[in-house]
Amino acid sequence: MLSTLIKKLKIKPKQISLYKMSITHSSYANENKLKKKDNERLEFLGDAVINLLMADYLYTKKEKENEGFMSKKRAQSVCEDSLVIYAKSIQLQNYILLGKGEKNKNINNSILANAFEALFGAIYLDLGYYIAKKVFILIVIPRLSNIIDNIDFKTQLQELVQSQKKTISYYITEEKGLDHSKEFTAEVFLEKKNVGRGFGKTKKSAEQDAARYVLNILSKGEKND
């Protein structure tokens, strides 16, 4: 069973015991009296590895973005919900070793996300950063754009301006193109002052793009303060 998972990762392990440990939940280890053989320590390491891999990717591929904005993207891309998406793409839930009590339940998102982190901890320990990066590119990157695209910039901006007791408004100021290929322009007003604009194929996406732009500008201002 573990060999099938290894094939999906397209790697050649040196220490197979690390990969077995990465999918061993504490309930299974306790039940089978496997001292220090659960995946919790690997999870700790894997969390740091995945954060570094994501930071590396964003720094390299998103040259125009500032530190504050990249931090927001990284946080969204490595949160529990995102880790679960990556884990399910390789059916990791089918390989996790659980105690009898846990087997009677559905594997929850926390267990699945933790196992995914532990798996990257194992890859890093066994094969190093370069191979961990190759697996990251194989599993994470193809799904990353959808996750980043689904960041709700309008809500983030709304929460920010509300904390400053200000109001924000959006207006669609331009609509061009044919029905099947329209492009909309949205402008953002903070306390009646035009602070940015965005573009999109729908009104909603144009407003999200405008909010993204303003957040980027505001985060630059915070960094300079």
UniProtKB/Swiss-Prot annotation:
CDD domains: DSRM_RNAse_III_family, RIBOc. It is found in: Cytoplasm. One of its GO terms (cellular component) is cytoplasm. One of its GO terms (biological process) is rRNA processing. The active site is at D47, E117. Its cofactor is Mg(2+). One of its GO terms (molecular function) is ribonuclease III activity. It comes from the Bacteria. Residues 2-128 form the RNase III domain. Residues 152-220 form the DRBM domain. Belongs to the ribonuclease III family. HAMAP family: RNase_III. Homodimer. This is Ribonuclease 3. It comes from Phytoplasma mali (strain AT). The gene is rnc.
